[in-house]
């Protein structure tokens, strides 16, 4: 009898402890959300009733602060915010979610629920669906596009609106620097603008890093981000055991940014580092890295449906700092930045965004939609490379039968216009600096 009583007392005590813990978590999270200093992003979200608002993107890219931006703008004090990466909620079970919400609603009676990184909870989608069916207004975030997509494609199909968050674009970057963007700049303002552009080219647009001045600290934090993405969003998420081998692969991929890759090329490079990974595993690992937003793979355009042997690889902001040839590759970094800006503008790799490579020419980007556009990226133009880029356009227009197409060459700071004639039709090539192109969207 005594043992049964002791067990009951322990259970009651455990329940009380859990209740106190959950209350602390809710109150702490509410305090964080209310006190957060938010610099608004240039991103809009549709607040459609009865739809679950899904916000996804790279770890540390600004998803949480975008939630705070939404709260500040639309909900003020009428919300509950729960960060499921709070260490006190690690391994929380589905039945405990109900208790957590019950306690949260006793503290703040609201219909507006903000769940940060809820994908770490098993069966989170069923919990969220039930709440949505009960009339709650729900916002969720996650760092994995595919894991979110899997649940969204089943339990939450037709019930969600998705918004992708990437690190800051250059316009937002300047806002974080308190630089006033306008149409014309004085000599001093232009010099300051180019100073910030150089910083953006070097480190990219992760929000926290943008607000730090010390370059050594910037690099340290970037390394923490790289490790966080690698260990939490790749190794842990996919239960990978051969960490040493996949880390070698990660480093190889970063060194190959803005380059064409193939499984065969990667396998040969792994051999040079005395590392063996099967081709099937390489393919799977590329998918894991892509899912975690560490890399992006862009396919060579073709009108024919065929097996893709080669892709061009790009990395998320600033990761080029960990390339061995970083200092020599400003052109590749600029190309990588152009790719990321195109992604921010809503173009999706291998759906309406490609590169074009044939035996005798190459074009960095093809936007293949209602309005077609060819884009070359060249850090600094001279007579030799200008002629090469123009000839590539002439060949691409003929080869791909692009009668009506916009043509751009994006540079560091060169600008102007060139005219070409293809099959008796005149085309205008706009040469535009990256900073101007990125600020006029």
From Swiss-Prot:
GO molecular function: ATP binding
Source taxon at top rank: Archaea
Nucleotide-binding keyword on record: yes
Full protein name: Uncharacterized protein MJ1544
Keyword entries, A-Z: ATP-binding, Nucleotide-binding
Binding residues for ATP: 57-64
UniProt cross-references to Pfam families, sorted A to Z: AAA_14, DUF4143
InterPro entries documented for this protein: AAA_14, DUF4143, P-loop_NTPase
Biological classification of the source: Archaea, Methanobacteriati, Methanobacteriota, Methanomada group, Methanococci
Originating species: Methanocaldococcus jannaschii (strain ATCC 43067 / DSM 2661 / JAL-1 / JCM 10045 / NBRC 100440) (Methanococcus jannaschii)
């Amino acid at each position: 009898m005594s043992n049964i009583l002791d067990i009951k007392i322990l259970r009651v005590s455990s329940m009380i402890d859990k209740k106190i813990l959950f209350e602390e978590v809710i109150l702490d999270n509410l305090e964080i959300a209310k006190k957060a200093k938010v610099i608004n992003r240039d991103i809009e979200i549709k607040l459609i009733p009865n739809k679950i608002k899904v916000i996804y993107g790279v770890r540390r890219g600004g998803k949480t602060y975008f939630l705070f931006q939404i709260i500040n703008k639309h909900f003020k004090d009428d919300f509950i915010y729960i960060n499921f990466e709070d260490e006190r909620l690690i391994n929380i079970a589905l039945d405990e979610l109900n208790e957590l919400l019950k306690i949260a609603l006793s503290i703040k009676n609201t219909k507006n629920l903000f769940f940060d990184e809820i994908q770490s909870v098993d069966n989170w989608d069923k919990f969220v669906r039930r709440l949505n069916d009960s009339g709650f207004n729900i916002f969720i975030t996650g760092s994995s596009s595919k894991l979110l997509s899997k649940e969204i494609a089943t339990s939450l199909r037709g019930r969600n609106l998705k918004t992708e968050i990437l690190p800051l674009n250059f316009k937002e970057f300047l806002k974080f620097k308190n630089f006033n963007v306008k149409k014309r700049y004085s000599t001093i303002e232009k010099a300051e603008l180019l100073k910030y552009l150089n910083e953006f080219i070097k480190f990219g647009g992760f929000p926290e890093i943008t607000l730090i001045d010390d370059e050594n600290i910037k690099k340290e934090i970037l390394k923490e981000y790289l490790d966080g993405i690698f260990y939490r969003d790749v190794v842990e998420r996919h239960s990978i055991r051969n960490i040493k081998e996949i880390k070698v692969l990660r480093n190889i991929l970063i060194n190959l940014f803005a380059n064409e890759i193939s499984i065969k090329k990667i396998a040969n490079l792994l051999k040079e580092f005395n590392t063996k990974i099967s081709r099937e595993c390489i393919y799977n690992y590329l998918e894991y890295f892509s899912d975690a937003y560490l890399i992006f793979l862009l396919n060579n355009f073709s009108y024919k449906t065929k097996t893709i042997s080669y892709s061009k690889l790009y990395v998320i902001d600033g990761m080029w700092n960990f390339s061995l040839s970083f200092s020599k590759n400003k052109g590749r970094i600029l190309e990588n930045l152009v790719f990321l800006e195109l992604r921010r503008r809503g173009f999706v790799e291998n759906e309406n965004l490609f590169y074009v490579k044939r035996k005798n020419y190459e074009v960095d980007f093809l936007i293949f939609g209602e309005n077609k556009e060819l884009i070359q990226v060249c850090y600094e133009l001279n007579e030799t490379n200008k002629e090469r880029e123009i000839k590539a356009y002439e060949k691409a227009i003929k080869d791909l039968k692009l009668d009506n197409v916009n043509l751009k060459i994006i540079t560091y700071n060169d600008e102007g216009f060139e005219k070409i004639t293809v099959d008796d039709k005149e085309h205008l090539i706009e040469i535009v600096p990256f900073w101007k192109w990125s600020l006029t969207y």
